Amino acid sequence: MILFAIDYLERVWTLKVPSVFSYYSTRMILAAITSLLLSIFLGPYFIRKLYELKIGQSIRKEDCPLLGQLHEKKQNTPTMGGILILSSMLVSLVLWMDLTHIFTLILFVTTVFLGLIGGRDDYLKLKYKNTKGMSARGKLFFQFVLSAAIASYFLLSSVNEMFEKWTWFQPPVIKEQIVVKNSETLQEMPSQTKSISLKEYASRLYIPFFKEPVVTFGGISLILMAFFIFFVITGSSNAANLTDGLDGLLAGCLVTAAGSLCLIAFVSNHVDIARYLNILYIEGSGEIAIYLCALIGASLGFLWYNGYPAQVFMGDTGSLTLGGILGVSAVLLRREFLLGIVGGIFVAEALSVILQVASYRLRNKKRIFLCAPLHHHFEYKGWPETKVVIRFWIMSLLFAIIGIASLKFQ
């Protein structure tokens, strides 16, 4: 909206608005501040309303009885606090992002769509007073629908051509460097850039610490890329959901993971920095950076009330959606494997559950961990909740640093 306002004031009222307000860096800062302040100042009113509506959290006791004792004080703490986070982010989106860019549309649809799924999941848990909620198949189906829509836009020429023709949304412009070597000295000559199509862009698979794509899909093999997109979005969404089990744990880990992707999105939108790092120049990826800044601000504001002892939980409304936003952002930036590094805590949490279930079924009910996800295992070992959270935050920060460093060490 800020860009519309600037254009209107300059075109209709002939007022000269400082160009600083159109800079990506400025809008990133303003988006973070907006969502942070909204989360903090609306938090008390929102939490009070949740108490009045008796939207309390149920505690998992079935397969980990000790959790009922450890988390007894958390019983009936309000949940669905993700509504506060998502609302703050969407306000920032409307105020500070370019509403004509396709990345803005994709991130908006992702937030609303996954927010509704998470909200439905929380509603069923509250209705039946248990921790089951929606069936796993039901959630996977809707996550597949979202992933299929995003994959179709990038991989099917007819779909993105339709958007270019019939909508006002600007497609991203992607350029790669062409490095020429002198045949005699074998030294690299000044690089040039060439534009690549959305389909070619989306068909490439990049791995951290490697400059060039390791695989480029084409033809029928594009189906594999579509399933890979589904795996990334669904995996990140559900992994974040599994991580949301201790006061402040997920919010803190989201800040570091989103911060890493935010930095990558910002430098990908800068011609000179992209050339220096020898990465793809993605015109418009700054919009992703703005939204991730809004996510960071909203998460920090929510952490104000979600830190130990938590006054509110984000619930699946927040965790499923925020994890999905990270996954979608990684897909848009073609940094899916990098997300596996910067979101290392999410990967560890998800793997702990997968290994625990597999071991229980295949090894005659033998368990690898005392309790899964991983953070509960350390609780069972006697670690205080705050110590588990802080140590996981430290590891999350370490993973984020490694992920960012991979851009330089290619």
From Swiss-Prot:
Superkingdom assignment: Bacteria
Pathway of action: Cell wall biogenesis; peptidoglycan biosynthesis
This enzyme's EC code(s): 2.7.8.13
Signal peptide coordinates: none
Keyword annotations of the record: Cell cycle, Cell division, Cell inner membrane, Cell membrane, Cell shape, Cell wall biogenesis/degradation, Magnesium, Membrane, Metal-binding, Peptidoglycan synthesis, Transferase, Transmembrane, Transmembrane helix
Pfam family, any one: Glycos_transf_4
Localization, UniProt: Cell inner membrane
Cofactor annotation: Mg(2+)
Keyword Cell cycle: yes
A GO cellular component annotation in the UniProt record: plasma membrane
Gene Ontology biological process: cell division; cell wall organization; peptidoglycan biosynthetic process; regulation of cell shape
Catalytic reactions of this protein: UDP-N-acetyl-alpha-D-muramoyl-L-alanyl-gamma-D-glutamyl-meso-2,6-diaminopimeloyl-D-alanyl-D-alanine + di-trans,octa-cis-undecaprenyl phosphate = di-trans,octa-cis-undecaprenyl diphospho-N-acetyl-alpha-D-muramoyl-L-alanyl-D-glutamyl-meso-2,6-diaminopimeloyl-D-alanyl-D-alanine + UMP
Segments passing through the bilayer: 27-47, 77-97, 99-119, 140-160, 213-233, 248-268, 288-308, 312-332, 337-357, 389-409
Main localisation: membrane
Broadest EC class assigned to this enzyme: transferase
One of the record's GO molecular function terms: phospho-N-acetylmuramoyl-pentapeptide-transferase activity
Membrane topology: Multi-pass membrane protein
NCBIfam families referenced in this protein's UniProt entry, alphabetically: mraY
Family designation: Belongs to the glycosyltransferase 4 family. MraY subfamily.
Function: Catalyzes the initial step of the lipid cycle reactions in the biosynthesis of the cell wall peptidoglycan: transfers peptidoglycan precursor phospho-MurNAc-pentapeptide from UDP-MurNAc-pentapeptide onto the lipid carrier undecaprenyl phosphate, yielding undecaprenyl-pyrophosphoryl-MurNAc-pentapeptide, known as lipid I.
Annotated protein name in UniProt: Phospho-N-acetylmuramoyl-pentapeptide-transferase
Species: Protochlamydia amoebophila (strain UWE25)
This protein's encoding gene: mraY
